[in-house]
Amino acid sequence: MDRVVLDRSAFKIAIASDPAQSTALATALGVAPIKSDGPQSYAIRRATANGMTTLAVLGSDATGAMYGGLDIAEAIRLGSLDTLASADHAPRIERRGIKFNVPLDARTPSYSDNGDAAQNNIAEMWSFDFWREFIDEMARHRYNVLSLWNLHPFPSLVKVPEYPEVALDDVKRTLVPMDDTFSHSGNDMVRPDLLAKLETVKKMPIADKIAFWRDVMRHAHNRGVEVYWFTWNIFTWGAEGKYGITSQQDNQKTIDYFRASVRELVLTYPLLDGIGITAGEHMEDRKDQFSKEKWLWNAYGRGIVDARKLEPDRRFRMIHRYHQSSTEEIMDAWKDYPDTFELSFKYAIAHMYSIPNPPFIQPALPSISKDHRTWLTVRDDDIYSFRWGNPEFARAFIRNMPDRDKMAGFYMGPDGTVWGREFISTEPERPRDLVISKRWYSFMLWGRLSYDPELPDSLFERTIAKRFPEVPAPQMMRAWAEASKVFPQITRFFWGDIDLRWFPEACLSHPRAAKGFYTVRDFVEGATMPGSGVLSITEWRRSKLSGTAMNGVTPLEVAEALSKSSAETLRLLADLRARQAANKELRLTLGDMESMAYLGNYYAAKIRGAVDLALFDKSGQDADRQSAIKNLQAALEYWKRYARAYTVQYKPSQLYNRVGVVDIPGMIPKVEEDIAIARRWTPGTVPDTLKERPADKPFQK
């Protein structure tokens, strides 16, 4: 970027995009130089001379200069340019990313393809208009990493000289309806019946596909965004059966094919910054020459080494996930990797909207060095429908992340849906909104605060005021924050670690892999999130009946917090609704808040009913049972209100790949069944100490 100067009568904006330009500009204006020369840093300086005011952006690099320019553009838009003060800015978190499961093609699926969102977004993945808007939104919110996840993307990305028939022309989608019977490890994501009925979404030879992704990466590079592909292993969709390639771990032909494909990926995409790999979820835990880590090194590591022999100056980052492997085996197998080698940890497992300080990384921290730092996978498998927004929670979550000597960065996103265009609205825009655009406030909070957690709430308030001038911004912001407290409150109380075990929008888990709808008995017997300081119902009952101190937040306190947030949301909404006028986005945003408030009231009443039943289980007193029934009847009414509010804005039924079909109004009979469960409850059926449940293990030594 060259130095840019914009005049506006008695006002001038000047932007410098490297240290030399910044020093020269600071000297010319007689202002202090930029303090940080680190990547993405910038300073804003205000100078006045001879009646002319100059706002200068001193960038340490092009990205820093862009961020400074965005600050000035924002100040112009919000009407605060005259008060924009001189200040220095550097990122708190160096790399701030999005995790995006990419449904490339029915023949090269992502981990999320057996769901409505993935199927509807296949064509969008091959639209440059989509990626231009998506990446531009990322940059505005200060994200600088785009991680693209797919089980086996190579046939849709490269043409390998040794395996030319593997490369796939055109983009195809199956005409067979998806369902909830697929494996949760991806090993049957391509089925013969799916391949028997394909339609061509877009005519596109492999050469055009390569040109397309080069253009996407070039646009990302121009916006300061690094791009990475991530894979799971061993999947050979699109290549299976060709040249003797199979998914068998001891098949040397498969290893050779992967090695050549990785080499070509590096060589084909000069702007690709690296690759991320997984030692699963389709690998055997072998201890021979075909062990997980030896296989990965021979397939991926040697492929990268081969590419670097041809391009010795090429930098290429390797990110190895902890998932389904051990630290010792990883570090031993990859000790000779010739470039940056980092790890990746599922930070809050599947639920970022839980507590601001997830404890799961603590056992791993001592083994993480500054030479091999970890990335955080920050999974959002809590909220698929609604517009979330609570700066207090986001700021606390970010501040609790490990320091830079341990953490390379993070990428956030879901496995259970796809952050492409939304396809659930009952009154969609044309074309349909990108999820990142629909949920702009949430993405703004996480992106801007991860760059600078000291940003004041006043910035977000001014932004809301500009976007929704019909309503008082402080009131709108408070209602949004209160509604957004529902998801963390309930998820820390009723914990299901991985995505298929807990989807709080629907009180649901996968119907076969877990329990389906969680009943009031499940709540009585449920566990709370480790490290949350919240007591489960059985822990609370034990303390209450023994007369010992409550060593934590009680279930009734959780219920009260949910009720309080929901009541405050609905109180504020009454006035906001009266002012919404014809602003469609405002109306829909308030509708999301209303839905979240009714959901919070539902969970509060259900927890109270579960507490009553836990006492009845010990006392046998009918008064406890009747109190439970009353609370569960209230829960039913709140669910009905939730269903009405939800279906005003969203299709009532969607298929998600991790929990199956979610039908909010269709679940009313299941909610009613809780009342019947209470009526027929037999005392003495809940032990004081419950069996330990299966738990995800994100770290192994």
Task: Indicate where each model-derived feature is located.
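Mature N-terminal, pre-catalytic/accessory segment of carbohydrate-active enzymes
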Residues: M1-H152, H282, A299, N551-K701
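Short, Lys/Arg-enriched charge-dense amphipathic segments
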Residues: I15-S36, P103-N114, P153-F154, D169-D179, ...
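Generic detector of short, locally flexible boundary/turn motifs and exposed helical patches
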Residues: D18-A24, A62-A65, S110-D113, P192-L194, ...
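Hydrophobic transmembrane alpha-helix bundles
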Residues: A32-R45, D113-E137, F182-L195, E264-I275, ...
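Feature activates predominantly on carbohydrate-active enzymes
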Residues: K35-K253, P270-L271, H372, K406, ...
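A generic structural signal for ordered alpha-helices
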Residues: I44-N50, P109-S112, D116, N187-L198, ...
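C-terminal non-catalytic alpha-helical accessory regions
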Residues: T83, D129, S183, P414-D663, ...
